[in-house]
Structure formats: structure tokens, C-alpha cells
Amino acid sequence: MTSAMTVQELAARLGARLAGDGERPVCRAATLLGAGGDAVSFCTSKRHLPELRRSGAAAVLVRAEHEGDCPGTALVVEDPYLAFIEVVELLHPEPSAPPGIHPGAVVASDVVLGDGVSVGANAVIEAGVELGAGSTVAPGAFIGPGARLGTGSWLGPNAVLAGGCRTGERVRIHAGAVIGADGFGYAPLPDGQGWRKVPQIGGVDIGDDVEIGANATVDRGALEDTVIEAGVKLDDHVHIAHNCRVGARTVIAGGTLVAGSTTIGRDCLIGGLVAITDHIRIADGVSLMGMTGVTGSIRESGAYASPLPAQPVRQWRRNTVRFTQLEGLFRRVQALETGHGMVGDAGEERDD
């Protein structure tokens, strides 16, 4: 679904300075080279100036220093990328589900429904649930007993908000995500006879303005809640284990795994496929490069990394063999230092 307006109207909505033809109608957002005469695009840096100069867009969002490079109409703003987000929202408004309960939904008799709630086909909402005003439960979604979906929130198709879990306002939980599955807790039985499941009686507490990607999982706490603070963004396939706390405004990219009882600070940026061990603390303002393995607490803000970059396979094989020889090399250097009365790093084994 698209919406149309003139470039001049768009400039007024954005608070942009118009340089060029403001009467042209626009109805879509596009890339610089994919834009035609009905589209708006954006340019954020000099790296994209060649594409800007070739663009056929009706208007382009640019900074003041790039206005002269725009072949057509320029919309001059301080931050073209943020302004472009607003353009997308204006020209491509997200369709909203109609208020009401679909006849195919199963809704317990004591569910508290706020004004304008929408419940889709085959959704199941169990006893004691509260749905905030303007919230949406998409087709096939499940909400367990006593859970709460906050005002203006959206639970996507086939997503689960398990019993006793709560969200704040304006939360988006995408398709297939599971909030409140049991945490991974087992106690070993005597004599190696197996494992006994530890009951998980905590919940999940999600703050305002959180977004959780498709097929992500946030496990309920063992005794107390797993907590996702306000403004957190979790990508698809992220896993947050039981008893964790993720600090406000932290962003975690796809495939990252956070083990139990770990606390991640506020305003952290965590790349994809990061593995974070259990029972540690990560300070506010930490950035972790994709594929980093975190095995201990990080107490100072800053950027951290530990991935192995790709290399030609023959080189990788040689380096792998050399890595297995490190212990022997260490012992040889240690013996040489000892024989010559030298004291060096090779003479000390350290675990840190």
C-alpha cells in the first residue's frame, strides 16, 4: 500500500529545505539508481555521489554539502537517513489490522480487551490475559494464562507470549518468536542416572519500544524474571536464556546466543553469531564484532572482537597444524630460556 503527495508537501512534513521542482507527485521510496520520476531517494555520504549524479529520482534527500551534486530536486536535511525513514513511513504506511476478534479465534471469557484490539484467525488467548488498547494479535499467535500484551503492541503470526510474561507499550514480536519457554535447567541425578528438570517459575518482562525478530527466543526465568529493558532490538534467531537481563537500547544481531544469568549493559551493539557465556556481566556501551566468543565479564565500554577471518584453505590448514604444535614450541622455548639463565614470558604459564 502506498500514499502519494507532492515533493513540496513532503518537504513540509519533513522540515526539509526544497531546492527544485516541488510540484511533482511522489508515491514511493527507492534506491538512488532504482528510483524513477515518482520516487524519493537519499544520499548519506560522498561515497554515493556517483549514484546520486545518475539518479532519476523525483527528489533526493541530501545534506547541504551535496546539494550541488543532485541532478534534480533536492530535499536538504541534516540527516538524510533518518529523514528517509520518515519518507518510507509516509509513502508506505503499514496496513493495520481491523479492530475486533476474528470468529476463528479462541479467546477466554475473562480476557481484558482494551479499545481497538485486533485478534486474528486461529489465535488462542487463554485465561487472565490483558490486551492493551490498540494491540494486535496476528493469526495463529498464542498468549498464555495471565500474560499481558501492552498498549499498541503487536504479536506476529504463530508467535508465542507464554503464561505470566508481560510486554510494555509499542512492542513488536515477529512471526515464530517464542517468549517465555522454559529455561534450560536440569540437575544431575545420583550415580549418573540422568537429569531432573528444574521448574522454571519466573517470567519474562519486556520494556517499552522493544522489537524481537522472527524465530527469536527469550526463555522465562527460573525463579525471577528474564528482563528485556526498554528500546532493545533483537534480530531474527537471537536466543536469550533464562535469568538474563538485556539493558536499555541494546541491539543484538541475528544468530547470537546469550547463556543463562548473564547481564548485558545498556547501549551495547552486538553483532551476529556472537556467543556469550553464562553468569557474566557486560558493561554499558560495549560493541562486540560478529562471531565473537565472550567467555568472561567485560567491565569497560569499547569495541571487542575475536572472530577468525576467512583465509585460503591451504593457509588455514597450515595454521591449524601450527596451532596444535604451540605446546611443543612453548616447552622448547622454555627449556632454552632455562638453559641460558633467561627469564621471559615463555617461562610462565598464565590462564588469563
From Swiss-Prot:
Gene3D superfamilies: 1.20.5.170, Hexapeptide repeat proteins (2.160.10.10), MurE/MurF, N-terminal domain (3.40.1390.10)
Protein name: UDP-3-O-acylglucosamine N-acyltransferase
Subunit structure: Homotrimer.
GO cellular component: membrane
E.C. number(s) listed in UniProt: 2.3.1.191
Keyword Lipid metabolism: yes
PANTHER family: UDP-3-O-ACYLGLUCOSAMINE N-ACYLTRANSFERASE (PTHR43378), UDP-3-O-ACYLGLUCOSAMINE N-ACYLTRANSFERASE 1, MITOCHONDRIAL-RELATED (PTHR43378:SF2)
Keyword Transferase attributed: yes
Pfam family name, one: LpxD
Catalysed conversion reaction: a UDP-3-O-[(3R)-3-hydroxyacyl]-alpha-D-glucosamine + a (3R)-hydroxyacyl-[ACP] = a UDP-2-N,3-O-bis[(3R)-3-hydroxyacyl]-alpha-D-glucosamine + holo-[ACP] + H(+)
Family listed: Belongs to the transferase hexapeptide repeat family. LpxD subfamily.
Summary of the function given for this chain in its UniProt record: Catalyzes the N-acylation of UDP-3-O-acylglucosamine using 3-hydroxyacyl-ACP as the acyl donor. Is involved in the biosynthesis of lipid A, a phosphorylated glycolipid that anchors the lipopolysaccharide to the outer membrane of the cell.
Entry annotation: catalytic residues: 242
Top EC class, one word: transferase
N-terminal signal peptide: none
Gene Ontology biological process terms, A to Z: lipid A biosynthetic process
